[in-house]
Amino acid sequence: KALITMFKNAGFNAIRVPITWYPHMEAKFTTSPWNPETDPIGTQIQAAWMQRVHEVVDYVISKGMYCIINVHHDTGTSNTHWLIADETNYAQEHERFEAVWAQIANEFRDYDEHLLFEGYNEMLDANNSWSYASSENAGKYSSTAASAAYNAINSYAQSFVNAVRATGGNNAQRNLIVNTYAACCGMGTWNSHLQDPLKQMQLPTDNASGHLIFEVHSYPSLNNGLNSAKSSIDQMMAAVEAHLASKGAPVIFGEWGVPDDENENDCTNKNADMQAFVRYFVEQAKTRGFGTFYWMGLSDGNHRTVPEFNQPDLVEAIVKGYYGNDGYTGVTPVSTAPQMANGRLYDLQGRRVTHPRKGLYVSNGRLVSR
C-alpha cells in the first residue's frame, strides 16, 4: 500500500496490475515442468487469490487512482501459457477464458469507472512469434498461419467483451481493454509485416458505445543513440494512429521502456539519453492522446519493500513529460462552473473536455478534480 501511495504522490494517477491466474485455478501440478496440455487447470478461481487481487485493487482505488487488472502470465512464451493466438486453442480454451472473466467481473461488478479490465497480455501464436504473427514459423512466413493467429486474437477479444458485459451492474459500461497480437505496436521498418498486428486488429462488437480501448506495448532501443530512438517513436506512434486509433477507440501503451538487455547499464551509462527518451515518449504520446504505463523499472526488486524509486531521474522526466517543466504540483479542487469555463480542461489522455463530469482533469499543466 505504501508503494501505491508513493506513485500517487509522485504524480501518477493510474496503475496496471499484472495478474497470474493459472496457479489458482484448480491446478494440480502433477508434472514438472508443468504442461497445461497434459495437466490441465480448472475454471474456478481460488477464493483466497481473488481476495488478494481485491486487496491490491483497493490499494490503488483508495488513492483516487485508476486501476487496470488483466490476465497476464497465462499468455506469453513460457510453458505455463494456456492462452495462445491459435484457432484450435481458442476452440479448446475460450469457455475457460470466459469463465475466468465472468468470475473477475462478478467480483468487481459494483466498482466504478476507476477500475478497468484488460482481457489478456501478450498472446502469441503456437510458434511464439514476436513482432508479428508467423515470424517464427518453421521455414518461412505463412500468411495462412498469420491470418489464423489474428483471427484467434479477435475471437478472444470478443469473448472477453461478451463475458464481462453479461455480468451486468457497472460492468455493462466498464472500460475494457483489448490488446493487439502480442501487444505489438508496429515499430520498425525491417519487415513489411510489422504493422499487420495493428491492421488486423478489430474493434469488438459492444453494446456499450465508447467503452473499449486498444493496448500496445513498446520498447524502443537506445543502442543506436537518442535520435534513432526518437525516430522509432515517431514512426511507431504514427503507425498506431493510422492503423489502430483510427478504428474508433483510444489507445494506451500498457507497457513501455527499453529492452531488458539494456536496463542494467542504461541508467548509469546513458542517463541523460534515458531521461530525454522517456520524456519524449510521454510528450509524443500525450500529443496524440495515448495513455502510457511504464513497465516495472521505476521501483523494482528490493526497492519496492522500502518503498523507494530506484530510477528517480526517470520518474522526474516522465512526470515532466506529462505535466510540463513544473512537474506534478498536486490536485487543485475545482468546484464551480465559472472556474472551469475560464480555463481549458483536458482528460488524462490529453483530450479537450468541454462538459466535464466528476473526475480528474488537467488544466494549465495542473491536475484538478471536479
What are these regions (language model features)?
Residues 294-300:
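Acidic carboxylate-rich catalytic motifs and surrounding loops in phosphoryl-/glycosyl-chemistry enzymes
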Residues 360-370:
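C-terminal tail/sorting-segment detector
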Residues 99-116, 120-290, 305-320, 324:
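Extracellular glycoside hydrolase catalytic/binding regions
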Residues 327-349:
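Residue-level detector of functionally pivotal "anchor" positions at catalytic/ligand-binding pockets or at interdomain
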Residues 301, 307-309, 362-363:
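Short, exposed beta-strand-loop hairpins at the edges of beta-sheets
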